[in-house]
Amino acid sequence: MSTHLCAIYKSPKREGMFLYVAKRDQFDSVPEALRQMFGKPQFVMLFNLNGEKQLKRSKNEEVLQAIQTQGFFLQMPPPPENLLKTFLEQNRGEA
């Protein structure tokens, strides 16, 4: 199995938003509007998409395919948890 390393960057503007690119510090394939929205990328790590470890919120195969076709993958933050809904679901039978 071949190695497909990618560089992972976090956004300083939005917590939980990550940008994956094929090579460290190469953002030519990332549209200018996205770069402006993302902010100055903060390097997190290099990651082997073909390795045994899986990404937590994205599938390795999807990230690799996006990088190969469009040159980058943008991972959006998870939706905020609805605390009221969670509370009500947990306390349904206690009234």
Swiss-Prot record:
InterPro entries: YcgL-like_sf, YcgL_dom. It comes from Actinobacillus pleuropneumoniae serotype 3 (strain JL03). Residues 4-88 form the YcgL domain. PROSITE patterns: YCGL. The lineage of its organism: Bacteria, Pseudomonadati, Pseudomonadota, Gammaproteobacteria, Pasteurellales. It comes from the Bacteria. This is YcgL domain-containing protein APJL_0712.
